[in-house]
Amino acid sequence: MVASGSGGRLKPLVWGLLLALLLLRVVLVACMPLQPAGADPALLLEAASSPELPLELTGTLLGDPRSSVGTASCRALLQLPVGRTELRFGDCPPLQEGWRLRVRGRLRRPQASPHPLLAAPAERLARQGAFSQLQVQDFNVLERPATPVADLRRRMAQALVRQAGPDRGGVLAALVLGSAVVPVPAELREAFRASGLSHALAASGFHLSVLLGVVLPLGARLPQPARLGLAAAAMGLFVLLAGPQPSVLRAVLMGALALAVLESGHRSRPLGILAASALALLLARPDWLLDVGFQLSVVATAALVLSARPLELGLRRWLPGWLPGWLAAATAVPLAASLYTLPLQLLHFGVVPLYAVPANLVVAPLLTPLTLGAMALACLAVLLPPLLPLATVPVDWLCRLLVLVVQAFAELPMAQWQLGRPTPVLVLLLSLALLALVLPALGRRWRLLGLGLLVVAVAVHLSLLGADQLLLVHQGRLDLLVARHRGRAALVSSSADGFSCSQASQLSRGLGVQRFDWALLLDPLAPEQPDCWRAQAGLVLASADGSLPLQPGQRLASEGLSAAPVAIESRAMELQLGRWRWLLLPDRQALWAWQERYGPGRGGFDGLWLGFRPSQRERTQLQRLGVERMWLSGAIPLGWPETWAASGPSGSLQAVRG
C-alpha cells in the first residue's frame, strides 16, 4: 500500500518534470539567434568586402509579388535550393506563386533595426528564413507549374474585390482567406487596428468555428466516420485557404482534438486541449513562441476558457436588471480577451485600443453572418460565377455597415491610447497582476497582491515616461532626435522624407507620445509628405525653398523643450530639455559656423551631437568643450575617445536624467 501511494505521488512529479524540460527546450531553441544555412547566398555577402554583390539566382516564388506599405516598391520571397531571399522590384511584375524564376540583380543584407521600437526588414525576413535581399534588375520565367491552391485563393480574392471594390472586397476576402493571404488597403487595416478589431481580419479560431458551425449540423445524421471525415475536410480546406499560419494551425489542432474527445464520449477540457495544442506546435516549431500572432491567439483563447464565464456572472450581478441578459455574455468575451492580451499589446505595440470592448460588442451581430456570407460568395465565385453579382448585394450592405462602424470607432478621440512599450520586467509584473485580478479561483489575498503589483508597474512606467530623456536614432542618412521632458516630447529630424516620418510615427507609439509638441525638420528640401508630419506634431517647422526653418533670433519652444539656432546660415542648433543643454551639429558647416561665431573654447553644454565624422583636429577642438556626453551618428572612428559614444551604422543612443 505504501509503495502504491508513493508511486501515485511520483507519477505527477515525473510528468511535471518532463513537461518543464520540454518547455525549457522550446524556450532555448526559440531564443537562439537565427542563422543562415551553409549554402545560403547571405554568406557570400559576409565574404565580400562590398555591401552589395551582383548575383544570379534560381528559385521558386513563395507568394505573389506584393506592394510594400508606404513605398512604391514591390517584394516577393524566393525559395532557393538552400535558404531564401527576398526579391525587390521597382514595380510589381505579373508573376505568380509557384513559378520558377532566374533573377539577376544586386544582393545585399536587409537593413537591421536601429532601435527596438522600430520595425526593420532584417528581423521580419529572419522570421521567414531569409537573410538577404536581391534588388532585381532582370528576370526570366523558367517554368509555370500548376498551383491549384494558389489559383483558388487568387480567384476567390479577385472575384470579391471585383464585385465589392478594393476596400469592402478586401475585407470580404480577408474574412475567408485571412489578411496574411489577402492584403487589405493600409488605411482600412489601420482603422481595424485602432478600433481593436484586427482579429476579425486574421484567420483564426472564430472563422473556423463559423465554418464548423455550418458543416457539423449538416453531418449530424451521418455515421461517425463520415461525420469526422466531413469535419476533417472542412478543417483541411480552412488550412489550405488561409495558409499554415501559427494561429490557423492552433485553431485547427485544437478543434480536431476537441472533436475527437467529444466523439469518443469523453468530457472535453478546453484548457487541457489548448495547452496540448500549443505545446505540440511549439515542439514542431519552437520559433513560433516569439510569433506575435501565435501569442495573441493562445492568450486570447485562454482568456475565453478561464475567465469569460466568471466575468459574465459578475457582469450579470453588476449590470442593472432592466438591461437584457445577453449583454453580460456578449461583453464578457471581448472584455476577457482584452484584459488577458493587454500585456502583449503593450509589449509589442505600446498601444491600447481604448474602445475595443464596445467596438466588438457593436460588430458582434455582424461578424458571423458576414463571415458566412463571404464564405458563400467565395464558393459561388468558383462554382457558379454568374450568380455572384446578385448574391454580393446583401453581403456588401453588411460589409459597408461593418466598415462604417470600424471607421467611426477608429476616429474617436484617443482610439489608440499610446502608453509606450514598457520594459519586459514591467510587462511581467503587469501580467502577474492581471492574472491575480481576473482568475476566478484566486481569493481576496491574491487580488490585493495583484492590485499592489498593478500599482507598482503603473507607477514605475509613468516615472520612466516622465523623466528627461534624449534619444538619437541613426539609420543611413536618417537622424532622429527625440527630446522628452515630464511626459512631453519634441522631435528634431535631419531628413523630411516619408521614411523619416514613418520612423518618427513608430517611435512616438513605442515611447507613449500621443503627439510631439513640435517637430523641427533640418532638411533643406521641403517635406515629401506634409500631412504625415502634421499628424505627428502640433507644430512643424520645415524648409520650403532651401532656407533654414529657424533663423537667428527665433526660438521654437514648448513647456520645458526648446530649440534655437546658434549660428547664421547653418543648421547648428541649441536644444534644451529641462535643465539639459545640448549642441546639435548635423554637418561640418554647422561646426565651422558655430566656431566662427563663438570660438573653439565656448562650453556650457551638457551634451553635443555630431551628424558627421570629425577630423582629428576637430576632435581635439571639441574635447576642449568639456561636455558630459559626446554623441556621433555613424561608425566609431579609429582613435575615438572611450568616453564618447557612437550610434554605429544603424543604431541608437539614449540619455536619461531624473
Outline where the language-model segments fall.
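Hydrophobic alpha-helical segments of integral membrane proteins
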Residues: 148-164, 171, 188, 196-197, ...
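Hydrophobic alpha-helical transmembrane segments in multi-pass membrane proteins
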Residues: 12-24, 134, 184-356, 373, ...
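Fold-independent oxyanion-binding glycine-rich loops
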Residues: 137, 175, 180, 205, ...
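N-terminal Lys/Arg-rich, disordered targeting/topogenic segments
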Residues: 1-7
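Non-globular, low-confidence helical/coil segments that flank catalytic cores
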Residues: 91-106, 117, 123-125, 130, ...
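Divalent metal-coordination and catalytic microenvironments
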Residues: 59, 105, 175, 204, ...
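Membrane-interface helix/helix-cap signal primarily in integral membrane proteins
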Residues: 15-199, 502, 506, 518, ...
